[in-house]
């Protein structure tokens, strides 16, 4: 039996090399990403011969949801099975956004963030992260990354034009799979597709300085998030072995070269671990480290998981840490850990074996 190719892996110009004329590619994109077609036979504006040809050569179901769990805060974690049987997790984070209309009335509507995985497992080996425990199995293709987002939007009846933010903060190190992640960014941004602007896509990294520079040179327009978590190389290497290859100085040099929209900032994620990196002297060092960088610090309270030796700090300590940063002019927020009760929060995702 002929192996079908994942059509979600293709940019329009690539698909145009296989399908003529080009306006048919536009129609196919719209059927898949905007009309949420279930199969090629649904694509009624295409001639019958083309629908048959597509069905004989392509599929657009690279991920299959085998389980989902909803948190009391509304977050939903999805366990996806890939074609080869490996599994990844993704999270939908619904949030309420309020605006004032022309009449001065307060209007509330849903805003969505989708946290996607870029690899099955991860080789970075961060000591606080559950994903790293199983090592790296393989990279996801661009279509497997896009497939997570498409499935979640479709399943939750989120219209294609509804604004969503994408964060590459699920399983894996996105910049260790830069080729496919950057292609996913481009596919998601297509006007005939989901039309998710690169400015709404944030790529997080544990600090691969070389790849940060490569990403910057691509000029995709994406936002950058650095998983920092420590203010000196000794502690950071203990928490994140990747620091042996790319130390803090190398990361900061790469960040300074990274092109960022004047209205945006580079996000620095700082995981607060009780008694390890949450002291006020750490906050003071962080202020010095970020001097001259347009930065926003996202403080995250450590999320416990099976086998972890670390503890979650008190909210009181986190607020003191935040207050010191803010008093020195550093934009800083404490991230609300959504999905904590279903192990969907930062550092809790993993490749789960076939349990069902």
Swiss-Prot record:
Q: Where is the active site?
A: 89 (proton acceptor), 346 (s-methylcysteine intermediate)
Pfam families documented for this protein: Radical_SAM, RlmN_N
Q: Which cofactor does it need?
A: [4Fe-4S] cluster
The cofactor remark states:
Binds 1 [4Fe-4S] cluster. The cluster is coordinated with 3 cysteines and an exchangeable S-adenosyl-L-methionine.
Q: Under which main EC class is this enzyme filed?
A: transferase
Binding residues for S-adenosyl-L-methionine: 172-173, 204, 227-229, 303
Please give the SUPFAM superfamilies that the UniProt record associates with this protein. Radical SAM enzymes
Q: Where does [4Fe-4S] cluster bind?
A: 122, 126, 129
Which EC numbers does the record give?
2.1.1.192
Q: Where in the cell is it found?
A: Cytoplasm
Which terms are listed as keywords in the entry? 4Fe-4S, Cytoplasm, Disulfide bond, Iron, Iron-sulfur, Metal-binding, Methyltransferase, rRNA processing, S-adenosyl-L-methionine, Transferase, tRNA processing
Biological process annotations from GO: rRNA base methylation; tRNA methylation
Task: Give the highest taxon in the source lineage.
Answer: Bacteria
Supply the CDD domains for this chain: Radical_SAM
Q: Which SMART domains match?
A: Elp3
Q: Which cysteines are joined by disulfide bonds?
A: 115-346
**Domain Radical SAM core: from-to ranges:** 108-341
Does the entry feature the keyword Methyltransferase, yes or no? Answer: yes
Which terms in the GO cellular component ontology are assigned? cytoplasm
Q: Which reaction does it catalyse?
A: adenosine(2503) in 23S rRNA + 2 reduced [2Fe-2S]-[ferredoxin] + 2 S-adenosyl-L-methionine = 2-methyladenosine(2503) in 23S rRNA + 5'-deoxyadenosine + L-methionine + 2 oxidized [2Fe-2S]-[ferredoxin] + S-adenosyl-L-homocysteine; adenosine(37) in tRNA + 2 reduced [2Fe-2S]-[ferredoxin] + 2 S-adenosyl-L-methionine = 2-methyladenosine(37) in tRNA + 5'-deoxyadenosine + L-methionine + 2 oxidized [2Fe-2S]-[ferredoxin] + S-adenosyl-L-homocysteine
Family statement drawn from the similarity comment of this UniProt entry:
Belongs to the radical SAM superfamily. RlmN family.
Task: List other remarks.
Answer: Reaction proceeds by a ping-pong mechanism involving intermediate methylation of a conserved cysteine residue.
Reported function = Specifically methylates position 2 of adenine 2503 in 23S rRNA and position 2 of adenine 37 in tRNAs. m2A2503 modification seems to play a crucial role in the proofreading step occurring at the peptidyl transferase center and thus would serve to optimize ribosomal fidelity.
Q: Under which name does UniProt file this protein?
A: Dual-specificity RNA methyltransferase RlmN
């Amino acid at each position: 039996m002929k192996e079908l190719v994942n059509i979600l892996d293709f940019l329009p110009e690539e698909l145009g090399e296989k399908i003529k004329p080009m306006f048919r590619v536009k129609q196919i994109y719209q059927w898949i990403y905007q009309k949420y077609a279930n199969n090629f036979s649904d694509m009624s504006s295409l001639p019958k011969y083309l629908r048959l040809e597509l069905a004989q050569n392509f599929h657009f179901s690279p991920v299959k949801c085998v389980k989902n769990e909803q948190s009391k805060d509304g977050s939903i974690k999805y366990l996806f099975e890939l074609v080869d049987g490996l599994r990844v997790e993704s999270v939908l984070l619904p949030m309420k956004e309020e605006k004032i209309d022309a009449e001065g009335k307060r209007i509330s509507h849903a805003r969505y963030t989708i946290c996607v995985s870029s690899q099955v497992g991860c080789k970075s080996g961060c000591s606080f992260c559950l994903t790293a425990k199983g090592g790296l199995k393989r990279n996801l293709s661009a279509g497997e990354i896009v497939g997570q987002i498409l499935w979640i939007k479709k399943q939750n009846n989120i219209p294609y034009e509804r604004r969503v933010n994408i964060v590459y903060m699920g399983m894996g190190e996105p910049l260790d799979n830069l080729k496919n992640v950057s292609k996913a960014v481009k596919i998601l941004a297509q006007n005939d597709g989901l039309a998710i602007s690169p400015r709404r896509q944030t790529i997080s990294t544990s600090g691969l300085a070389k790849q940060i520079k490569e990403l910057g040179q691509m000029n995709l327009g994406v936002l950058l998030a650095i998983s920092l978590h420590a203010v000196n190389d000794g502690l950071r290497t203990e928490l994140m072995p990747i620091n042996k290859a790319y130390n803090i100085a190398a990361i900061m040099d790469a960040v300074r070269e990274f092109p960022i929209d004047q209205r945006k900032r580079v996000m620095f994620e700082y995981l607060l671990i009780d008694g390890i990196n949450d002291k006020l002297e750490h906050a003071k060092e962080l202020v010095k480290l970020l001097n001259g960088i347009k930065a926003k610090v996202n403080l995250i309270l450590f999320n416990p998981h099976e086998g972890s030796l670390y503890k979650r700090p008190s909210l009181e300590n986190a607020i003191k840490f935040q207050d010191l940063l803010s008093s020195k002019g550093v934009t800083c927020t404490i991230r609300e850990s959504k999905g904590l009760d279903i192990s969907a929060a930062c550092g809790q995702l993993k490749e789960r074996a076939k349990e069902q």
